[in-house]
UniProtKB/Swiss-Prot annotation:
UniProt xrefs under Pfam families: Phage_T4_Ndd
Keyword DNA-binding: yes
InterPro entries: Phage_Ndd (IPR009514)
Keyword list, A-Z: DNA-binding, Host-virus interaction, Inhibition of host DNA replication by virus, Modulation of host cell cycle by virus
Role noted for this protein: Disorganizes the host nucleoid and inhibits replication, but without host DNA cleavage or degradation. Only the architecture of the nucleoid is affected. May act on the host chromosomal sequences that determine the structure of the nucleoid. Binds to dsDNA but not to ssDNA.
Identification of the protein by name: Nucleoid disruption protein
GO term, biological process aspect, one: symbiont-mediated perturbation of host cell cycle progression
UniProt organism field: Escherichia phage RB69
Disulfide linkage: none
Gene Ontology MF terms in the entry: DNA binding
Length: 152
């Protein structure tokens, strides 16, 4: 099993939405419409632009449809409140993390299509069904990749 990298995220079509430090937005806050989207949010440390730098993904979070439309802002609130060991680590380690967003509709290369070539990926069943949850996709990510700050 390998660590997920920025290259994996870019190949799946993830977009950078901002940077955080200690559970707070660093260098500007993205618009609420961006933060309330359901999908997966990945934290990457040390995204410094060096030509051969391919940093590993530190952590992943998923956000479903919410009536309150808090989205990733709720995750940041949990980090600031230090509600888990992961949240305490992110809040206290004084590192800047780049936040990548990937909607569930683009998860196929990282879940059921992981490790397959372009042709095989085209014929791989789509992982998304009305009965499949973001939790199941999260477990598939854990089956395919390791994350620096998360054991599962």
């Amino acid at each position: 099993m390998k660590y997920m990298t920025v290259t994996d995220l870019n190949n799946a079509g993830a977009t950078v939405i901002g940077t955080i430090k200690g559970g707070e937005w660093f260098l500007g806050t993205p618009h609420k419409d961006i933060l309330s989207k359901p999908g997966f949010y990945f934290l990457v440390s040390k995204l410094d632009g060096r030509p051969f730098s391919n940093p590993c993904v530190s952590a992943r979070f998923y956000v479903g449809n919410q009536r309150s439309k808090q989205g990733f802002s709720a995750v940041l609130s949990h980090i600031r409140q230090r509600r888990s060991q992961l949240a305490r680590t992110i809040a206290n380690n004084n590192m800047v993390y780049t936040v990548f967003y990937l909607p569930a509709s683009k998860m196929k290369p990282l879940t059921t299509g992981f490790g397959k070539g372009q042709l095989a990926l085209a014929f791989t069943r789509n992982h998304h069904s009305e009965y499949q949850t973001l939790e199941e996709m999260n477990r598939m990510l854990a089956d395919n990749f390791k994350f620096v700050l998360q054991a599962y």
